[in-house]
From Swiss-Prot:
Transfers and isomerizes the ribose moiety from AdoMet to the 7-aminomethyl group of 7-deazaguanine (preQ1-tRNA) to give epoxyqueuosine (oQ-tRNA). It holds the Pfam family Queuosine_synth. Keywords: Cytoplasm, Queuosine biosynthesis, S-adenosyl-L-methionine, Transferase. It catalyses: 7-aminomethyl-7-carbaguanosine(34) in tRNA + S-adenosyl-L-methionine = epoxyqueuosine(34) in tRNA + adenine + L-methionine + 2 H(+). This is S-adenosylmethionine:tRNA ribosyltransferase-isomerase. It comes from Acinetobacter baylyi (strain ATCC 33305 / BD413 / ADP1).
Amino acid sequence: MQLSDFNFDLPDELIARYPLDTRSASRLLHLDAHGHYHDHAFTDILDLINDGDLLVLNDTKVMKARLKGKRASGGAIEILVERMLDNQIAHCHIKASNTPKAGAELFVGENGIKVTVQGRHENLFVVEFSEPILSVLDRYGQLPIPPYFNREAEEIDTERYQTVFHDPQKIASVAAPTASLHFDQDLLEKLAAKNIQKTFVTLHVGAGTFMPVRTDDIKNHIMHSEWCDVPESTAELIRQTKARGNKVIAVGTTATRALESAAQANGGKIDAWTGDTQIFIYPGYQFCVVDRLITNFHLPESTLLMLVSALSNRNNILSAYEHAVQSKYRFFSYGDAMLIDQAV
């Protein structure tokens, strides 16, 4: 399939650059298994999910991963921490007027904390901080909100660009699992009262989630690598859910990629798994675990649009997106949501 097969026109004013006042106040577009779409409020999810179904959510936490600083010569630089290798060494993106070389010393924060470039790892820099990374990020970092917000991170993002159920010990993402941003505590309690179970996986979202596809034939695209964990407790709940004929509902493309990666690693069966994944899901992929997906509206020609097109199909998705544009749904990370059923 060609990259252009996944293009659509999106008016700039439909990009949601700030969250709504209430998390669960978003709209929801339900795309059913036959390709028909239906307009809802997000809280209607209570009526669209059945007793005994299982929600799978990503419990990662977003780091304040963006640091502004300078070279020893005084030139401005920006560091985005992609992955911590240990307490003081990380893989990073670095923006600078000239590419830093191994041995270059950079300085961040008011006290000029030293960051030494050790070398390269693929398209990333390997750097060593003179102090513990999380401490530096906590003091001087900014939340790495998406580039299409066209603004700096603000105080509202500190709360609203995190899920209400994130695990504070799992602080390693550079982007939020945005489908989960619609869930507030009240909605989660109402889902539990209806006997809709929830469980968690972890996928630490990398900056590659924002990288454009640069190949005309999508099969030639190489996915970025992200670390994920599907614990045995989650795998067991999924097996039980499937055994009684209920649905597994992934909340977000990150949860989807974690679940399907675990299944691929275990011969198509869901089992516990931890590791790096580069899974690329596009039309033709046969899902092993996920029956339904709650997700936001995605960018044209993005791998995430290809993923949702694999669960339904490309024509269904593009038709639903056309309706969403005409109906002025809000798009992207702070936007509205879809509930997508696997096409029959």
